[in-house]
């Protein structure tokens, strides 16, 4: 591996350890010429996951987009950023483990709503109102009734 400081090809590994819950390996390296120390990460190259949008366009999956949507929905709510990152990671892991290379944006939206309903009901309603594009108050009220019915069913 080339040294990022002097661009010499000779480096040696000083330390290796698992990182990112075992999905990558962190290596501490040192250049044989200038003795500059740096860290590299080795991970399996994943096949791209493609999201098929409602209008039929395709784009590469972006975990950042999911996280931004979660953060927006949970704005001024008592939800930790770590919890939202965990949800994002869980959704991505579930999609990648499914073995499919293309996923509909609707599927991702439903997964996000399912997770939000477990975390914070207000955030769930916020996300659902944007995601489902409620046209009027009656549709919004119906969604709230479904949420209440679901919550009462879980308590029973």
From Swiss-Prot:
Note on cofactor: Binds 1 zinc ion.
Cofactor: Zn(2+)
Ranges for region Disordered: 1-21
GO biological process, one term: negative regulation of DNA-templated transcription
Record flagged with keyword Acetylation: no
Source organism superkingdom: Bacteria
Residue span, ATP-cone domain: 49-139
Keyword DNA-binding: yes
Molecular function terms, GO-annotated: ATP binding; DNA binding; zinc ion binding
Keyword list, A-Z: ATP-binding, DNA-binding, Metal-binding, Nucleotide-binding, Repressor, Transcription, Transcription regulation, Zinc, Zinc-finger
Pfam family, any one: Zn_ribbon_NrdR
Zn-finger region bounds: unnamed: 3-34
Function: Negatively regulates transcription of bacterial ribonucleotide reductase nrd genes and operons by binding to NrdR-boxes.
HAMAP family referenced in this protein's UniProt entry, alphabetically: NrdR
Family statement drawn from the similarity comment of this UniProt entry: Belongs to the NrdR family.
Protein name: Transcriptional repressor NrdR
Organism expressing this protein natively: Anoxybacillus flavithermus (strain DSM 21510 / WK1)
Taxonomic classification: Bacteria, Bacillati, Bacillota, Bacilli, Bacillales
């Amino acid at each position: 591996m080339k040294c990022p400081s002097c661009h010499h090809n000779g480096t040696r590994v000083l330390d290796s350890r698992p990182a990112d819950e075992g999905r990558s390996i962190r290596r501490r390296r040192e250049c044989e010429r200038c003795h500059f120390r740096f860290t590299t990460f080795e991970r399996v190259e994943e096949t791209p996951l493609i999201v098929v949008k409602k209008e039929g366009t395709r784009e590469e999956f972006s975990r950042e987009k999911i996280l931004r949507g979660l953060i927006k929905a949970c704005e001024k709510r008592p939800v930790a950023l770590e919890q939202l990152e965990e949800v994002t990671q869980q959704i991505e892991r579930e999609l990648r483990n499914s073995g499919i290379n293309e996923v509909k944006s609707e599927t991702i939206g439903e997964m996000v709503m399912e997770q939000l309903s477990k975390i914070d009901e207000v955030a769930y309603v916020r996300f659902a109102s944007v995601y489902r594009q409620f046209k009027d108050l009656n549709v919004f009220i119906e969604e709230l009734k479904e949420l209440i019915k679901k919550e009462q069913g879980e308590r029973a």
